[in-house]
Amino acid sequence: MPVAKITAALPAALDALRAEAWPVAAEGIMTTDTKPKLASTQVQVGEGSFSITGITKGAGMIRPNMATMLSFVATDLAIAPDLLHKALVRAVEQSYHRITIDGDTSTNDACTLTATGRSELPAIESADDPLYATFCEALEGVLLELAQMMVRDGEGATKFFQIEVQGGASEQECLDVAFTIAESPLVKTALFASDPNWGRLLAAIGRAGLVNLDVDKVTLHLNDVLIAEQGQRAASYTEEQGVVAMAPTDVVLKVGLNRGDASTTVYTSDFSYDYVRINAEYRT
């Protein structure tokens, strides 16, 4: 890395800083993204307020652990460093760690959170401060919005797939099921074709590694249409219902494991012809 060149350029970069430059920065970090990703919120607290703004880039190679994505977030609150770190870890776990494009990864990722302290609100020094809970909730909302933007702009994506796994024995097994479905090439290509292929969904659940899984207890809903139960196609289900359920750009799959109280949600996209083209043509 040319440290001397970077250091020499810092003064000019600092002089060029301006509050309205977030969109420029969002565009500057793009790689195979087709559009910049920027999210912001302002939260009113009594007579004062605080804001959180973030940008991110990433359209493939997102999981695990953010893979090749970059995210830069800032707030004008003043927050103790340890509390800021704890809030970021929690928010990332429920957002950037809940998405996947292709299940592939790389060694280059970063997510930073900066607190400038320019808000007129008092500094947060304790996790028991009610303002801290408000901040954590707002931060999670901004990061989840950015995470979903990445999925919607996934390489070649034509569909946004929300996978809700409920009734698991633990959150981890819910995640195992959700990500096995989300990263199945057969599921993702069926999604691209708007094919309500319940067999591929059940097959993915079956190989997710759950101990003593009773397939007869599993239920599948696509956009609220019951498509499978007791290990087979639901008696009330028709192919016409499935086609209608799969037609929208946004598709929600609800998986009922019925073996506990845990649940989680994961977001992914489909595999299209363009996904193959983009990655066949891309050169690093």
Language-model features: locations:
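A structural signal for small-residue-enriched, beta-sheet-centric alpha/beta enzyme cores
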Residues: 1-284
